[in-house]
Amino acid sequence: MEEKEQLRRQIRLLQGLIDDYKTLHGNGPALGNSSATRWQPPMFPGGRTFGARYSRPSRRGFSSHHGPSWRKKYSLVNQPVESSDPASDPAFQTSLRSEDSQHPEPQQYVLERQVQLSPDQNMVIKIKPPSKSGAINASGVQRGSLEGCDDPSWSGQRPQGSEVEVPGGQLQPARPGRTKVGYSVDDPLLVCQKEPGKPRVVKSVGRVSDSSPEHRRTVSENEVALRVHFPSVLPHHTAVALGRKVGPHSTSYSEQFIGDQRANTGHSDQPASLGPVVASVRPATARQVREASLLVSCRTSKFRKNNYKWVAASEKSPRVARRALSPRTTLESGNKATLGTVGKTEKPQPKVDPEVRPEKLATPSKPGLSPSKYKWKASSPSASSSSSFRWQSEAGSKDHTSQLSPVPSRPTSGDRPAGGPSSLKPLFGESQLSAYKVKSRTKIIRRRGNTSIPGDKKNSPTTATTSKNHLTQRRRQALRGKNSPVLRKTPHKGLMQVNRHRLCCLPSSRTHLSTKEASSVHMGIPPSNKVIKTRYRIVKKTPSSSFGAPSFPSSLPSWRARRIPLSRSLVLNRLRPAITGGGKAPPGTPRWRNKGYRCIGGVLYKVSANKLSKTSSRPSDGNRTLLRTGRLDPATTCSRSLASRAIQRSLAIIRQAKQKKEKKREYCMYYNRFGRCNRGECCPYIHDPEKVAVCTRFVRGTCKKTDGSCPFSHHVSKEKMPVCSYFLKGICSNSNCPYSHVYVSRKAEVCSDFLKGYCPLGAKCKKKHTLLCPDFARRGICPRGSQCQLLHRNQKRHGRRTAAPPIPGPSDGAPRSKASAGHVLRKPTTTQRSVRQMSSGLASGAEAPASPPPSPRVLASTSTLSSKATAASSPSPSPSTSSPAPSLEQEEAVSGTGSGTGSSGLCKLPSFISLHSSPSPGGQTETGPQAPRSPRTKDSGKPLHIKPRL
């Protein structure tokens, strides 16, 4: 693609050269043809592509001075790049053929142009002129901002060649091979040669019958000039400085016109018989001067209205550095450009060296050859006439040190000033200069007040020169050595406090000056705004004007126009009571400052952790000079704003506290399953006693806490009980079975509400009300792993436990025999026995004190069924869930019961398989004496306890 682009650029360049050649050296006018001396513009199609044929019919009555208008419209370079792709074909041609016209009087011609790419990477362009000598009055192509020029009518013998140096050649990549342009026998030859280290040369050799020498047209990559060589018999004709815009990195016309318009007499390799070589600059038309002056004046007016900042421009791009010129500079540059082009001087203007010190430049610098790689860029599209700050001119020194009144700058490293260093003319006109002392080309040094920089011998104390500056009285405040803030008065914005890094716009009624200092400052202007920034970014603006958007950034050239940050120390230093001329503070200042008081806006506030309360009196009222106007007192307004802000903050804190205390519309899982919650009143979930799980011991008739101290519910509800596993198998014969007899599908999901302890749907719920993981019960492996909310019970242990001699059932003997027969008696290994003994010992030790934290952990490993024999058939497992609960103890319970060792706590508490059990201290001892009671409950049909095997 890069090679294609290079080829396209070269083809365009050569076509432009050919058109220029025809423009300047068209065939001689035909005899007797009145329209031969007039321009005959081409009628190009809209999308002109290579390989297409198009006609160039002449137009009647189109004089030569109308050239630039149609050139701009039908320019060859203005076409998009994608319109032609000539490099895809090694040999392609563009032919120009005229079409038959209805008018017999205008002359028409056929121009055949062939562009070929030879195999040795050479470009061959052939142009076949028409057979009639007077048919061609070729027209040039204007590129970019080519200036309009009047072509003279050639009356004598036409010149044979010319040398043209075109800018932009250095932007085109050099090709290793030469590009040759060949012609037919009778055609003029254009040979484009590019040798390394030498400029690109296009030789135009005319194969004419006479013995006139050959001339060449040179395309240089360094400068712009037009060298026209004539025989001695020809009159002196003028040349045109062609500013051709080639490629994206092209220079504008203003650069070429103002900065680089000169004529260079070049050496030509011609015999001595050629005669003298004459090269003169063509006088510029009024359109050129008008465009140049309009361009510069537009830039000047734009600069006056906008803020500008330094923006690093690309070093490769020779674009104009957008600097603004003063009216005087603009006038001088316009006059010099006009006079320099009209005068027939042959020596070129001297170039501006970027390394030359700007103090030595007597003339304004040329935009085309800017010594700085930075350019002005507008930072604000809108401009305001009323500004916070004004440009002040300071006379009395020769070098016109630019100084902007109150605002310090943070210049970037390597930036160069726009108007050059100190000895240039005033940049913004007669009465506007910036507040910076430019010491060198790389540093911008800020001036402090009116004092000169030490070491600058040439500077004298500046004096006000305009009528607006008589109000500007500056006075240093004798506070603290170097960093003492300086109060300055600007015409429309009240006092400005300037220290090393900040600028504060203070209303006059809030400036705390001593009586002696306040008398020296002009106080006649009412305050317009105020900005206060404290710890909580408190900002108060009066409706008369806004400090941030419209007025403040309109006059600041290079820094951001945001709210000026003020630290609390600066606020306290600025707003403290007045300091006397001797620099001693009032004796009352440390007293109120050390007691947690702060003076904000002249009002004393008492500061606490989250409260700001206003006090009744102001400190040191005698030493302060309050400047009151007809408006509302800004100090009172500020105090009200701060007080309301503190109130809003307090209310926000209260709202946040209330939101934290609000109960979520969700029941507490721990409270529902265990009857208690370790968080107590701090738990954000709902603790509803009606939703607590049913006491399984009460269901079996073995709960001793019938006085109401049992944490579980003694109200049996079907919504709280799991589904009877025997009912699902169809073998439950107990008419008074407390468990839910609801049939659900095997593929149904586990009810998440039931896992939390309570399902509001109850018997209508279509999901499984179980706590045992069905995947783990069937396969022994759960795909969810530790994140499963259901209990993973080991089947081997249940089978070993069901091998106890008395095997009870929930209803009668028949189901018990089935349940016992369905289990396989397996002898546990020694490792399992040791693990069981250790886990049972730990469980007993944790449950003995009946402390609340271990009780949910032990109880979580219990099951909800009243029959131990139904545990093997996965009736309702123990309610240990690993769901994300509001407490960490549930996760610990899951980790303890999910594994084989953790679930061995069932060995110590095998008396029931229930949701919960009361953490009574005797829970451990109850399992022992429950074994002899098994025969009685066996006859009564109630479920029996299983004696643990130790």
Curated annotation (Swiss-Prot):
Q: Where is the composition biased (Polar residues)?
A: 76-96, 327-338, 402-412, 460-470, 828-838, 914-928
UniProt keyword annotation of Zinc present = yes
Any one GO MF term held by the record is: R-SMAD binding
- Chief location: nucleus
Which InterPro entries does this chain map to?
A: Znf_CCCH, Znf_CCCH_sf
Quote the SMART domains the UniProt record gives.
Answer: ZnF_C3H1
> Any idea which UniProt keywords this protein has?
DNA-binding, Metal-binding, mRNA transport, Nucleus, Phosphoprotein, Repeat, Transport, Zinc, Zinc-finger
Identify residues that carry Phosphoserine. S405, S851, S855, S918, S920, S934
Cysteine disulfide partners in this protein:
none
Gene Ontology cellular-component terms for this entry are: mRNA cleavage and polyadenylation specificity factor complex; nucleus
**Could you state one GO biological process linked to this protein?**
positive regulation of activin receptor signaling pathway
Can the keyword Repressor be found in this entry's annotation?
no
What the protein does? Answer: Required for the export of polyadenylated mRNAs from the nucleus. Enhances ACVR1B-induced SMAD-dependent transcription. Binds to single-stranded DNA but not to double-stranded DNA in vitro. Involved in RNA cleavage.
Q: What is this protein called?
A: Zinc finger CCCH domain-containing protein 3
Query: What would be the name of the gene that encodes this protein?
Result: Zc3h3
